[in-house]
Swiss-Prot record:
The lineage of its organism: Eukaryota, Viridiplantae, Streptophyta, Embryophyta, Tracheophyta. It holds the Pfam family ATP-synt_B. It comes from the Eukaryota. This is ATP synthase subunit b, chloroplastic. GO terms for cellular component: chloroplast thylakoid membrane; proton-transporting ATP synthase complex. It comes from Huperzia lucidula. F(1)F(0) ATP synthase produces ATP from ADP in the presence of a proton or sodium gradient. F-type ATPases consist of two structural domains, F(1) containing the extramembraneous catalytic core and F(0) containing the membrane proton channel, linked together by a central stalk and a peripheral stalk. During catalysis, ATP synthesis in the catalytic domain of F(1) is coupled via a rotary mechanism of the central stalk subunits to proton translocation. It is found in: Plastid, Chloroplast thylakoid membrane. In plastids the F-type ATPase is also known as CF(1)CF(0). InterPro entries: ATP_synth_b/b'su_bac/chlpt. The gene is atpF. Belongs to the ATPase B chain family. Keywords: ATP synthesis, CF(0), Chloroplast, Hydrogen ion transport, Ion transport, Membrane, Plastid, Thylakoid, Transmembrane, Transmembrane helix, Transport.
Amino acid sequence: MKNVIDFVIISGYWPPAGGFGLNANLLETNLINSGVVLGLPVYSGKGVLSNLLNNRKQTILSTIRDAEERYEEATDKLKQARTRLQQAKIKADEIRINGLSRMEGEKQDLVDSADGNSKRLEDSKNATIRFEEQRAIEQVRQQVSRLALERALEVLNIRLNSELQSRMIDYHIDLLVRAAENTTD
C-alpha cells in the first residue's frame, strides 16, 4: 500500500506524459534553428545541384542523340539489307528459272537424241530385214533355177535322142545362115 501512496504523491508533482499537442513557443521548438540548418545547405548547394542537374541533362541529351544516330544507322542498314534481300530473291528466281529452262532444254535434247537413236535403230533393223529378205529371195531364185535346170536336163535327156538332136542342129544352122544372108544384103 505504501507503493500506491508513493505513486499518488509523485504523480502530483509531474504531469502525466500521455498526450501530444502543439507547442506555440518558437524558441522552445527550435524551428528557427531547424530552418537555418536546412536552408543553408539548400542555398549553398543550389549551384552544385544545378550543375549536377545540367550535367545529367547534357548526358541524357547526348545519350538520346547517340541513340537517334544509331537508330538512323540501323534503319539505313535495314533498308540496305532489305534491298540486298530483294536483289538476292530476284537473282535466286533468275537462277531457278534459268535452271528450269536449262533442265527443260536438256530434257528435250535427251528426248530428241533418244528419238534419233530409236529412228536409227529402226532404220538399221528395217535395212537388216530387207537385206535378209533379199538374201532369202536370191537363195530361193538360185534353188529354183538350179531345180529348173536339173528338171530341164532330165526332160531333155529323156526326150532328146540322136534324131531330135540332128534336127535341132540343122534348124539352128539354117537360122544362122539366113541371118548371115540378111546381113550381107
